[in-house]
Amino acid sequence: MPPYPAVRIPAKAAHTATVIFLHGLGDSGAGWMFLAEEARKAQRLNHVKFIFPEAPQQPVSLNFGMRMPSWYDIKELANVNAAQDQEGILESVGRLESLIKEETDAGVPANRIVIGGFSQGCAVSLATGCLTQTKLGGIVGLSGYVPIKDYILSQHNTTNQDTPMFLAHGTADQVIRFDYGKLSRDFIINELKFKNVDWHQYEGLTHSCGFEEISDILNWLEENIKE
């Protein structure tokens, strides 16, 4: 299975780590290039290659069946646990795993690879972190949730239980409600037994990524995939 197309930003120095970050519903990989640009402007994480995959164009029930960039179908946001597209989610997990393999085949150790995403991309990244048997360097989940919880609870393994995880959510998020973020955090810690979860909540932040959050992410990346 070939990986999805992606925006790839090479490391400025010797390439020893990779960040793979998935955008949200209706967005694009280019829409998250600012993470790499902020790091480059500050001369930070020069050893890191950034990959921003592009979701395929597909019909989305929430959008009246119209085609848009989407990692899986979404029927409603009022209850993110209702009628989930398990097949589509697992297909995107497989695509993300193929991107991880692309990097390990190129010589980057898996424990120097961080996966992450925003909103729908967060859901795919969290599912991947729970299900993969590859030991990762870190997992970043922004303004999202753990999807297909029953499946993940029955199929997850302990490979990444002590892998550093950065979870963040805005308190004023009206798309993926803040409560869903907290419930997912609690599920990850209490049910899946992840031991190294770094939780951040941002007062007044809507369904977006703020400057304070960007700074916190870059600091966290520097700490967990040191040069």
From Swiss-Prot:
The protein, known as: Acyl-protein thioesterase 1
Domain of life assignment: Eukaryota
MF term (GO), any: carboxylic ester hydrolase activity
Annotated Gene3D superfamilies: alpha/beta hydrolase
Cell compartment(s), UniProt: Cytoplasm; Nucleus
Keywords annotated in UniProt: Cytoplasm, Fatty acid metabolism, Hydrolase, Lipid metabolism, Nucleus, Serine esterase
EC numbers on record: 3.1.2.-, 3.1.2.22
One Pfam family from the record: Abhydrolase_2
Organism: Yarrowia lipolytica (strain CLIB 122 / E 150) (Yeast)
Class in the EC hierarchy, top level: hydrolase
Predominant localisation class: cytoplasm
GO process annotations (BP): fatty acid metabolic process
Function, as annotated: Hydrolyzes fatty acids from S-acylated cysteine residues in proteins with a strong preference for palmitoylated G-alpha proteins over other acyl substrates. Mediates the deacylation of G-alpha proteins such as GPA1 in vivo, but has weak or no activity toward palmitoylated Ras proteins. Has weak lysophospholipase activity in vitro; however such activity may not exist in vivo.
Similarity comment: Belongs to the AB hydrolase superfamily. AB hydrolase 2 family.
SUPFAM superfamilies linked to this entry: alpha/beta-Hydrolases (SSF53474)
Active-site residues per Swiss-Prot or TrEMBL entry: S119 (charge relay system), D173 (charge relay system), H207 (charge relay system)
Keyword Translocase attached: no
One GO CC annotation: nucleus
Catalysis performed (reactions): S-hexadecanoyl-L-cysteinyl-[protein] + H2O = L-cysteinyl-[protein] + hexadecanoate + H(+)
Keyword Lipid metabolism: yes
InterPro entries: AB_hydrolase_fold, LYPA1-2/EST-like, PLipase/COase/thioEstase
Recorded coiled-coil stretches: none
